[in-house]
């Protein structure tokens, strides 16, 4: 080639005593490997960090934002209100979509909310609640009675009050067990598992980051290392440039243009190879279709399933979270109505033939409201599930074991569909990022080694 291997700062031919061809045979593979490593390393970072959107406010952006195409608006480069330009990791930015995929592709395939709740020791949970409530039985009874009919309760002799406390205390285990049996049988109507998981993961995007970095840690490291594949592509580029000028028509294109285009292409190619090898195909394929036959993550399905189940059990589908969703979630009113009905039935059963007399003493309205007040007091016991960490972890272990078994039973294709679907939408951004970085590295090479 007629051009010299002389950069802006150094004449490499003179310095090394080698021809331009030899200099390029060494420099292009090195730079291409660096470009590949840099592209894939930063690409992995872009998947998860930052967890929260970081950017700067751009005057007038909120006026333009509504008119941008939807595909542009959902890019992680814009804040949700369209006022700031910056960046948020792909996975945290897609928390709602990923949560939806997690439910559709994983949770609902391995079991319904009823299946999960019945894996818990419901009798044990009920007994735990009853045991916790026993220390508060007088307080609960007093709270309800003073609220509904304070004059009557003040007039009741201490001995009678003690008898009421003891009667309620004695019936707590049975009442709690019946309540949890009923909750378990009606859980599908009381918990919208998809809405719950989506809302929870949207509020806690760091769990999504932990989920992916824990499950796919070996594959993420592989994605970075495979950036070194840029080296052989760089070698091919050096060999091609040696004959570029002799090729008709194409040889008219300046060599520096070829270097920039090839560098951008290498940045894209190593990214594509990394993503494909990690996520595709789920089920084993012939080598003439995929040289690696099966996605690397799919080959580790047993361990990946264990990691996924552990995170779901100990961070998402925990007993405190499920309790809070039951009582404070979108269907919390149904749960309260169920508890009220159970308590009302129990009061009527306990009072027996004295029911009409007591109802008359309380007043019809106050007596009926008693069941509502009692339900509210019972709901106040729910935080005790979160306070007893040992008990909560014992129940989480049951969910962990159940989810692990079920996730391992999924076909590799079904298992991988959940993970690939979560990054597929934004894969083109990773490829664009690879092209830009590759272009930058190619430009640096031209400055250092000439064109």
Where in the sequence are the language-model features?
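Transmembrane helix-loop junctions at the membrane interface of multipass transporters and ion channels
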Residues: 4, 8-17, 237-252, 449-451
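Large intracellular
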Residues: 4-216, 253, 257-422
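Helix-loop junctions at the membrane-solvent interface of multi-pass transporters
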Residues: 46-47, 241-244, 277-278, 448
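Short, charged low-complexity intrinsically disordered segments located at boundaries
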Residues: 131-139, 227-229, 242-245, 337-344, ...
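Bilayer-spanning, highly hydrophobic alpha-helical transmembrane segments
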Residues: 197, 219-240, 423-448
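Core alpha-helical transmembrane segments of integral membrane proteins
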Residues: 228, 232-248, 252-272
């Amino acid at each position: 080639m007629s051009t010299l291997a002389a950069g802006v700062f150094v004449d490499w031919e003179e310095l090394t005593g080698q021809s331009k061809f030899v200099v390029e045979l060494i420099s292009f593979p090195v730079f291409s490997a660096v470009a590949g490593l840099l592209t894939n390393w930063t690409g992995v970072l872009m998947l998860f960090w930052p967890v929260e959107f970081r950017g700067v406010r751009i005057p007038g952006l909120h006026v333009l934002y509504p008119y941008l195409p939807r595909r542009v608006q959902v890019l992680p480069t814009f804040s949700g209100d369209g006022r700031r330009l910056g960046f948020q990791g792909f996975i945290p930015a897609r928390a709602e979509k990923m949560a939806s995929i997690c439910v559709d592709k994983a949770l609902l395939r391995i079991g319904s909310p009823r299946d999960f709740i019945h894996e818990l020791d419901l009798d044990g949970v009920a007994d735990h609640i009853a045991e916790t409530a026993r220390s508060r039985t007088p307080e609960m009874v007093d709270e309800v009675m003073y609220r509904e009919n304070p004059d009557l309760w003040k007039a009741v002799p201490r001995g009678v009050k003690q008898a009421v406390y003891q009667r309620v205390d004695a019936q707590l285990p049975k009442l709690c067990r019946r309540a949890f049996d009923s909750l378990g049988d009606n859980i599908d109507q009381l918990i919208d598992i998809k809405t719950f998981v989506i809302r929870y993961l949207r509020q806690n995007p760091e769990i999504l980051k932990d989920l992916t970095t824990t499950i796919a840690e070996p594959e993420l490291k592989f994605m970075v290392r495979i950036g070194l594949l840029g080296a052989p592509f760089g070698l091919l580029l050096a060999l091609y440039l040696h004959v570029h000028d002799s090729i008709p028509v194409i040889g008219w294109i300046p060599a520096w243009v070829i270097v920039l285009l090839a560098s951008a292409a290498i940045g894209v190619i190593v990214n594509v190879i990394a993503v494909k090898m990690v996520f595709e195909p789920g089920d084993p394929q012939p080598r003439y279709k995929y040289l690696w036959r099966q996605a690397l993550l799919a080959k580790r399905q047993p361990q990946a399933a264990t990691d996924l189940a552990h995170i779901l059990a100990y961070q998402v589908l925990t007993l405190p979270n499920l309790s809070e969703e039951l009582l404070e979630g979108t269907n919390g009113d149904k749960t309260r109505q169920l508890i009220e009905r159970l308590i009302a039935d129990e009061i009527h059963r306990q009072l027996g033939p004295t029911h009409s007399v007591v109802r008359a003493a309380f007043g019809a309205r106050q007596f009926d409201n008693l069941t509502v007040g009692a339900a509210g007091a019972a709901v106040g016991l729910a935080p005790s599930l979160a306070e007893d960490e040992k008990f909560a972890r014992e129940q989480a272990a049951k969910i962990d074991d159940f989810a692990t078994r079920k996730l391992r039973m999924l076909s590799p294709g079904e298992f991988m569909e959940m993970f690939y679907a979560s990054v597929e939408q934004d894969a083109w951004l990773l490829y664009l990022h690879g092209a830009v970085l590759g272009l930058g590295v190619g430009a640096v090479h031209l400055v250092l080694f000439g064109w």
